[in-house]
Structure formats: structure tokens, C-alpha cells
A protein has these predicted regions:
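Conserved, function-defining micro-sites of small-solute handling proteins
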Residues: 1-161
Length: 161
């Protein structure tokens, strides 16, 4: 997602950068801290830990609202990049032929787990904002995200290799 977040920023702003692909947030974060790279979009657990100890400077959070774990960092929109939302999310998937009763049970158990106070706190400490949407809502969200990032890939000329 970090690669696409950078491409989206370039599409929405006058900023143009040379893309340096890293294999994960940890190597990308190290590259920025060492001066090998100038900027990177990082996942919240990596970024917030380094921002807190002043090894990285947070320039913008790619979300609609500021992150509670690093409230001093503005959103990308507040930083001047209008419409820059690039959420890192995880989905829970099952094979298409899974019986509805099993899907419903998995959904109930997932929502229950995400409602647990300890689970919510641990996720919040990592900068996560858990959402227990319905299977239909998640399917709509997934389709929307696929369309959005497919468009970013096309407009930016991104190629898989």
C-alpha cells in the first residue's frame, strides 16, 4: 500500500519523486532514517514508534482524521494534499462457496472479538481503527478500494514486475 500511497500523492499534488521500492515498512523506515531515502509512507506501527522517539518526522497521516497515537501529525489533507486517503486495512476472507451459516458465525465472532475492550486497546495502541462491518458492507468497500487503486495504478503507469 505504501507504494500506491506515494503514487496517489504524486497524482494529487505537484510533488514528483523517484520511486524506490522497498520490501516492507521496516526497510523503508530504515532507509529514511539513514538518509538513503528522503520520504516514505509507512504503516502506523513502524511510523509511530519512530516518530515518538524523534527518529522520523511525521509529515502527514493518509486518513480522514489525525491518528490518536500521533495527534501532532496532520492529515495529508491538512498538509495540503487534498483527497489523499490511503488506508492500510486488513480483510477477513473465505472461499466463495462457504455456506452462509458459516459466514454469519465468522462475522458474529469477529465483531465480538473486535468489541472486546482489551483487543480494542491493543489495536488502538498500534494505531489501528478496527471496523466490524457486515460482509455486504465489506464487499462494497473492497470493490471501491479495488477500483480506486486500479485507477491509481493506471494513471501513474504502475506496472507489476
Amino acid at each position: 500500500m505504501s507504494h500506491f500511497a506515494m503514487e496517489l500523492m504524486q497524482l494529487l499534488s505537484v510533488v514528483k519523486l523517484t520511486h524506490l521500492p522497498y520490501k516492507g515498512a521496516a526497510p523503508a523506515g530504515i532507509a529514511v532514517m539513514s538518509g538513503e531515502a528522503h520520504v516514505s509512507f509507512l504503516v502506523m506501527p513502524v511510523a509511530q514508534a519512530q516518530i515518538r522517539v524523534n527518529r522520523l518526522r511525521g509529515l502527514g497521516v493518509a486518513a480522514k482524521t489525525r491518528a490518536p497515537v500521533i495527534p501532532q501529525v496532520p492529515t495529508m489533507e491538512e498538509a495540503g494534499v487534498k483527497g489523499h486517503i490511503a488506508l492500510q486495512w486488513n480483510g477477513f476472507f473465505a472461499p466463495a462457496a462457504t455456506p452462509r451459516a458459516i459466514i454469519d458465525k465468522l462475522h458474529r465472532e469477529t465483531v465480538a472479538a473486535l468489541s472486546n475492550t482489551d483487543v480494542k486497546q491493543r489495536l488502538a495502541d498500534e494505531g489501528a481503527d478496527p471496523v466490524g462491518s457486515s460482509p455486504a458492507e465489506f464487499a462494497a468497500f473492497f470493490r471501491s478500494e479495488a477500483a480506486k487503486w486500479g485507477d491509481v495504478a493506471k494513471r501513474s503507469g504502475t506496472k507489476l514486475d
